[in-house]
Design a protein with these regions (language model features):
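Juxtamembrane helix-capping/reentrant segments at transmembrane boundaries
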Residues: 104-121
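Hydrophobic core of alpha-helical transmembrane segments in multi-pass integral membrane proteins
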Residues: 41, 116-136, 200-203
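Membrane-helix interface "capping/anchor" motifs
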Residues: 46-57, 160-172
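Short, strongly hydrophobic alpha-helical membrane anchors
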Residues: 1-31
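Hydrophobic, membrane-inserted alpha-helices
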Residues: 37-44, 61-67, 153-158, 174-182
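Membrane-water interface of transmembrane alpha-helices
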Residues: 84-102, 211
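Alpha-helical transmembrane segments in multipass membrane proteins, preferentially the mid-helix core
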Residues: 131-142, 149-167
């Protein structure tokens, strides 16, 4: 109960109580799982920003933990996001490491018109799928489920584009992360809400870094 006692001690500050009060009702296991998932989630985005393959093993750990945690908090859309992330991380890991004549087979590029069409199809197909999931489990509770469904669509597209090393995947992350900050805070997952605030900053930096990298290669070519 050490973690519970630590949270209880810092509750003397009203702002701390406002931010972290819900954690008093959580088990030690839930707090440890969320902290670990947040740590590896941030590490994964940092590696993604610098176009490093370690984005995938760190991401696999974070997403696996979040699947379990989000099921408990009935955020079914985000739970499916992380299950999808897990699968796409395996695909991305393979895709990024492929080489042709000793060179990286799939460098950073922009999305093509056909890929944009595929992205739109994936987005709307995801909205339909997540709406069905919420309805099937009788968890459609208004605005929270609606927002969760929308961000799920953005993140599905973002992960697919990232696995294919497309610059525009960062734009999906930026919008989705901004929306997720109040969503997770409302659900009482303050650490995850703060994580998405950090993700937003990293996504903006990542977008400019990938764009700069792409333009430098284009000039050389």
């Amino acid at each position: 109960m050490i973690i519970f006692q630590i949270f209880k001690l810092v509750m003397e500050n009203s702002w701390v109580d406002f931010l972290f009060g819900p954690y008093l009702a959580y088990s030690n296991a839930q707090i440890i799982i969320e902290c670990t998932a947040v740590f590896f989630g941030i590490a994964s985005v940092l590696y993604s920003r610098i176009n490093n393959i370690l984005v995938y093993p760190t991401g696999l750990i974070s997403t696996a933990l979040y699947v379990y945690l989000l099921w408990q908090f009935e955020l079914l859309g985000d739970m499916l996001i992380n299950a999808y992330y897990f699968i796409m991380s395996i695909y991305g890991w393979y895709y990024w490491t492929r080489k042709h004549n000793g060179q990286i087979a799939h460098p950073v590029t922009r999305t093509l018109p056909k890929e944009r069409q595929q992205a739109f199809f994936l987005f709307f197909a995801t909205l339909f799928l997540i709406a069905l999931v919420y309805t099937f489990f009788d968890k459609w509770n208004g605005i929270t489920a609606l927002v969760d469904t929308f961000t799920t669509g953005l993140f599905f597209v973002g992960m697919w584009l990232m696995a294919r090393r497309k610059i525009e995947h960062w734009l999906c992350w930026i919008v989705g992360n901004i929306i997720s900050i109040p969503l997770y805070f409302y659900k009482g997952l303050t650490l995850s809400s703060l994580q998405y605030a950090i993700f937003t900053v990293l996504a903006i930096l990542g977008y400019w870094q990938w764009k700069k990298h792409y333009l430098s290669k284009e000039v050389i070519a």
